[in-house]
Amino acid sequence: MLKELEVNGKRFFLAPESNFWAIGEREEVERFYRERKDALLEEMQRYRFEVDIRTAYINPTESCNRNCPYCYIPAEIRERGTKMSYEKLEEILTVLAENGVERVIFHGAEPLMVKDEIFRAMEDFDFKYGIQTNATLLEEEDAELLMKKGASVGISLDSPYKETNDYLRGKGHYDAVMRALDFFDGYRSLNIIMTVNKHNFQHLPAMVDFLAGKVSVMLANPVRGTSPGGRELRPPEGFEDYYIKAIDRAIENTKSGRRIVIGDFANILLGLVAPTSRVLQCDISPCGGGRRFFAVSADGIYPCGEFIGMEEFRANLSALSDWSSLIEKFEVVRKRTVEQIEECRNCEFRNLCGAPCPAEIYAESGTMLRKSPYCEFYKKLALKAMDVIARGDVRNVLKLERMKAIYRVEDF
């Protein structure tokens, strides 16, 4: 059944089960959709439920040289500080390669605490690599190696203002990131990750202006409530107004020649323009945890890094030797769908949002079957995506030249 919404003076028709949408007269849209519905539903079903692990997040150490108040990794684990030996890392990477994993992302705590091991691994194994770092331990030669390997690099920065950023991430962090931006000057696979919280949500538009011309992609992730500290720092109701202003600033910068995209929003927009092409796997249900990727830490394997510290979701590292049993272990996360959540099952945006994050919801309430604490935020972003479509700004967010058109409104 098509839902009708009015956005920016235009009537949108949306099929929530497939994310098909159109602007036009209901009778013509319904006829067009009926002719293609089965194929679109089949495609969405495959995208949502296919298990195909191609990415592994590896936390090679539990240690971090920072103590961010919203960290999703429990403090006792970071204090324990277990790290992988190179031999263990080598063993893990060998098994991943044998089972079809193509992309390895070194993740936090802080991966550069063991930079010698991960850089050696990058020389010894032929994966597509990524790293997420706070950049405080990054040296120029490290940046050169990462660029030589074509690695995607995500650097944390929470504000364009030094005082706020260092309040959240510790003294000296802002200056370290500024040095890193110089090291990576012009590198296309660099992005900045902002954790949006009650101390910095008002800085979102300024953050876009600050980063425009420095990076082409930034992520603006609302803080996860996986930890008590994260829940304490959630931004207040209405923070999405600043987020939407930031989206508009990104579009304005792009039009003026300084292209920058907020990746989280681009993924929502992609959920309408090309639903099964989405890269980020948080806003679909089941999410990508244990389905498209999993996380390997020094103490075990989890469907996603957000579950680290939750013993009931952990598999021993030895489970890598029995791949099919390991994948089966994470079925409990793959079974979690929006259709099981009372507030979500009839929502028109259920396959744009996915009710994230199951780890966050479980940590807070003991069940994964509740709506997202950011429900209203995702609804407003979905409507903003429709607004961007209605006003013809899609190409200022997504690179349409990289996509193949299958259906067009003009076909009616």
From Swiss-Prot:
Cofactor(s) this protein requires: [4Fe-4S] cluster
Q: Tell me which positions the record assigns to the signal sequence.
A: none
The molecular function GO annotations come to: 4 iron, 4 sulfur cluster binding; metal ion binding; oxidoreductase activity
Here the disulfide bonds are none
The record places domain Radical SAM core at 50-264
Name the residues that bind [4Fe-4S] cluster: 64, 68, 71
PROSITE patterns listed in its UniProt record:
RADICAL_SAM
Write out the entry's keywords from A to Z.
4Fe-4S, Iron, Iron-sulfur, Metal-binding, S-adenosyl-L-methionine
Q: Which residues form a coiled coil?
A: none
Checking CDD domains in the record gives:
Radical_SAM (cd01335), SPASM_CteB-like (cd21124)
Quote the Gene3D superfamilies the UniProt record gives. Answer: Aldolase class I
The source's superkingdom equals Archaea
- Report the sequence similarity comment from the record: Belongs to the radical SAM superfamily. Anaerobic sulfatase-maturating enzyme family.
Q: What is this protein called?
A: Uncharacterized protein AF_2204
Source organism: Archaeoglobus fulgidus (strain ATCC 49558 / DSM 4304 / JCM 9628 / NBRC 100126 / VC-16)
